[in-house]
């Protein structure tokens, strides 16, 4: 009962925490495992239900000045799969229980952020309240499946586009076309 009451107070000390461990470039190769300070932060974070990710601010500064292709090559040369900024975003999403789904039209593709467990009508409501109110169904295809097929039409022809109803829980990386009538 006490914990439930405390949660309603929205105390800053009750909020989830992410620790960014800034290390030298040499400590990135093993994700800071050989760094005693990183291990101390990880132990503290584990005891307190927090997350830790390792970055090198110097490398992040260099990455920020590169275009996408150069950035990818630079990260590969360092043996990294993602930048510290990408790690921060992913950790934030996990800690806050968020996912993204996509909508795509002829002129615009957009990502929408929702809570994990959100059903299709409520996800549609993030775009416009009329979408939620008049929700009929959602045409859903996985992002990677759509990329592999090249076009929405090709994905549909291969049977990868599913019709989902009001109880469908939107998943991270879904590409959704909402059908509604108001």
What label would you give each PLM region?
Residues 1-171, 176, 181-182:
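C-terminal-of-GTPase-core extension/linker across diverse P-loop GTPases
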């Amino acid at each position: 009962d006490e914990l439930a009451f405390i949660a309603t107070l929205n105390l800053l000390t009750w909020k989830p925490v992410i620790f960014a461990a800034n290390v030298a470039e040499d400590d990135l190769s093993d994700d800071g495992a050989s760094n005693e300070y990183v291990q101390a932060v990880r132990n503290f974070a584990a005891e307190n239900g927090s997350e830790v990710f390792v970055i090198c601010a110097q490398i992040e500064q260099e990455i920020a000045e590169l275009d996408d292709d150069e950035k990818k090559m630079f990260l590969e040369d360092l043996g990294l799969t993602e930048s510290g900024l990408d790690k921060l975003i992913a950790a934030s999403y996990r800690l806050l229980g968020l996912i993204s789904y996509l909508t795509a039209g002829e002129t615009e593709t957009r990502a929408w952020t929702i809570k994990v467990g959100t059903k299709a009508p409520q996800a549609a409501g993030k775009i416009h309240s009329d979408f939620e109110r008049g929700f009929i169904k959602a045409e859903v295809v996985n992002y990677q499946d759509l990329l592999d097929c090249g076009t929405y039409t090709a994905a549909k022809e291969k049977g990868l586009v599913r019709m989902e109803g009001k109880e469908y829980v939107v998943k991270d990386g879904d590409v959704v076309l909402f059908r509604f009538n108001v």
